[in-house]
Amino acid sequence: MTDQSRAQPQTATSTITGIFALLTAKPGVTRERVMAIMPAEIRATVKLYLEGKIREWYAREDGRGAIFLLNAKDVAEASSIMESLPLAHEDMLDHQYIPVGPLMPLGLLLGSPPAKQ
């Protein structure tokens, strides 16, 4: 399930270029349960990548999940993408979403005034 309360707020002045989705196995979910669904999860993930919805993905070093960089305009779109995957259908993962965009202070190098917050 998605925990929207942990999502970072989005401001109207920011430019969102992607959404990080941090997926963590829920407490009590065993490796065996995850591995039983993993072939379908991998196929679905590759399909989303080939459709341009997933830009990058990584395994978490702690072995508890994955981190995706999604081509999504907002958290709602990112959530829709992640909820389409088999492990989400089985309610095995917690999701956290973090919108990201350009490092706005770099505009100072171009002589642009900083965006007002």
What spans do the regions from the language model cover?
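Conserved, structured core segments of small domains
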Residues: 2-117
